[in-house]
């Protein structure tokens, strides 16, 4: 049970810090003058992963992302029961993080599109968004699988490599979708945002899972002993 709780806490921190930076960099920047820009948001997500990797990595492996859990499961590193429980607790943690963030922004008159840090895409941009989310999730999860491989991995540097990769992914993908590469990170804000964020949510669940599955296939080949 401890590893499930660890995943819940880690995902809560990721959503609160990452989406929180997006909210206060975008939706509230004009009113409080605290905008940090794309680089700042990217760093917030990446540094959250680094921090949690060294905080809970020894307990749960610090997936804090259903796409990563799927990749780990498909490479035979965890069983189906644990994979399912990880995903459930990740979503719960994300909802808690979004609830805290929603409470913070709803205390004032901040009715902005970025009020919860939800993901989305514009008219005619669905294919672009799907490709971006699938490709960048593929890259991200491949780095996770490679850097955490028991024999070929980066050891204690894995957390840093994973966090920096997430920073790079956000820098490129934020202008396209706001960057998800993490179904839990998208589900929770969409539940509080509603409307278009909820109607477009399917893409931010399916595309990351497609990318994660492809990364598992590739790593099963690359990491094969033969």
Cite the ranges covered by each PLM segment:
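Membrane-interface helix-loop junctions and terminal tails of multi-pass membrane proteins
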Residues: 1-226
């Amino acid at each position: 049970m401890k590893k499930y709780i660890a995943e819940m806490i880690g995902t809560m921190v990721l959503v609160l810090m990452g989406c929180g930076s997006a909210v206060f960099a975008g939706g509230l920047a004009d009113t409080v003058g605290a905008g940090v820009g794309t680089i700042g948001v990217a760093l917030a997500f990446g540094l959250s992963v680094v921090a949690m990797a060294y905080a809970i990595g020894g307990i749960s492996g610090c997936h804090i992302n259903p796409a990563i859990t799927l990749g780990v499961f498909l490479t035979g590193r965890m069983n189906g029961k644990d994979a399912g429980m990880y995903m459930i607790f990740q979503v719960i943690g994300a909802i808690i993080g979004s609830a805290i963030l929603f409470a913070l922004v709803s205390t004032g008159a901040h009715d902005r599109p970025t009020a919860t840090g939800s993901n989305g895409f514009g008219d005619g941009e669905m294919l672009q968004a799907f490709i971006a989310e699938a490709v960048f999730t593929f890259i991200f999860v491949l780095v996770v699988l490679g850097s955490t491989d028991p024999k070929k991995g980066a050891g204690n540097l894995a957390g840093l490599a994973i966090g920096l990769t997430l920073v790079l992914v956000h820098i490129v993908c934020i202008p396209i979708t706001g960057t998800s590469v993490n179904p839990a990170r998208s589900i929770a804000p969409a539940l509080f945002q509603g409307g278009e964020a909820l109607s477009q949510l399917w893409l931010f669940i399916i595309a990351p899972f497609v990318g994660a599955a492809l990364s598992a296939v590739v790593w099963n080949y690359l990491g094969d002993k033969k």
